[in-house]
Every structure is written in structure tokens, then in C-alpha cells.
Design a protein with these regions (language model features):
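Nucleotide/phosphate-binding catalytic cleft detector across ATP-hydrolyzing
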Residues: 1-8, 12-117, 129-170
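Short glycine-rich anion-binding loops that position phosphate/pyrophosphate groups of nucleotides
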Residues: 120
Length: 170
């Protein structure tokens, strides 16, 4: 199984085996998506293609199929662009799922919540008896967290981004 997530902060590809266990993954910080919308189509295709090639070399196999993850509630708004990016990078797009629901395909929770804190938004899925009963996309994410760090510590936004990603500050 291969999944592609075009995020506000990162573009990610994850590969799972037949038992849905992670076997490979790659990511790159990128500014190709803003507020769930692809704003740099060519850049997004290039990054996904490069990550795909990196993983194919690592696994010594060709990745043919991929599903895409999109922010909750944006399927009518931008899912076509996400699908086109995936296809433009050389995959056959098999499915598009909201990010939290896609995560639960791996987690397989029966009851609870999946919270996906992204760069620009936070996706939330509530599950009951294994079914998604509520989906929301809140307009707060890592970018907002960086703004808080910048203000609290008197840093530039870029310095706050670097500070936030440094594991010694966790």
C-alpha cells in the first residue's frame, strides 16, 4: 500500500506491507499547498516524483498504485488537483481519503478520535463501532503554533519553524 499526503508543511509518501505495517517512507518540507489547496502544481508533481523514485530505489521495486490523503471537507474543492499530482508523478491513483480516515485505515480504531495536526489545519475524525461518524477540519495547525513560538520567544517566523522542529525542544 502506498499513500501520498500533500500537506501544507510537508509532502509525504508512506509505503505499507500487506499487513499494513510501515516498510518505507520519505518526506520533504515544501510550500506547494496552502490551506488544503495545491498552489504549486508543477512543484508538487516534481516532489512526489522524486520521493517516489527515492523509495523505489530503497525498496528495489516499482511503486505503481497510490492513494491520496486530503484535508477533511475539501474533497469537492481540491481533490481533483491532488489526484492529478499523484498521477503526474507516475502513480495510478486508487483512492482519495480524508487524512484522519486514511490514518485510521492503518490504526483500525473502533471507537475514538483520530487527530491529524497538519501545517495549516487540524483534521479530526470521530469513530464509533469502526465507522466515521464525524469529520472536521479546524483552521489551526503547525503554522499557527510557529506564530505563537515566534511571538513568545521574539523570533522570526522562520526561526520559530526551525526551533519547533528541533527535537531538543520537545
Amino acid at each position: 500500500y502506498t499513500g501520498v499526503d500533500l500537506g501544507t508543511a510537508c509532502v509525504v509518501i508512506a509505503v505499507l506491507d500487506e499487513n499494513k505495517r510501515p516498510v518505507a517512507g520519505a518526506y520533504r518540507y515544501a510550500d506547494v499547498v496552502r490551506d488544503g489547496m495545491v498552489v504549486d502544481y508543477i512543484g508538487a508533481v516534481q516532489i512526489v516524483r522524486e520521493l517516489k523514485e527515492q523509495i523505489e530505489e530503497q525498496l528495489d521495486t516499482e511503486l505503481i498504485y497510490a492513494a491520496g490523503a486530503i484535508p477533511p471537507g475539501t474533497d469537492l474543492l481540491d481533490s481533483g488537483a491532488v489526484k492529478n499530482v499523484i498521477q503526474g508523478a507516475g502513480f495510478e491513483c486508487t483512492n482519495l481519503l480524508d487524512e484522519s480516515t486514511a490514518a485510521n485505515q492503518v490504526l483500525q480504531m473502533k471507537n475514538g478520535a483520530v487527530v491529524d495536526i497538519g501545517g495549516g489545519t487540524t483534521g479530526i475524525s470521530i469513530l464509533k463501532d469502526g465507522e466515521v461518524v464525524y469529520i472536521a477540519d479546524e483552521p489551526t495547525g503547525g503554522t499557527h503554533f510557529s506564530l505563537v513560538i515566534a511571538g513568545a520567544y521574539g523570533k522570526s517566523f522562520q526561526e520559530a519553524e526551525v526551533f519547533k522542529r528541533d527535537e531538543s525542544h520537545h
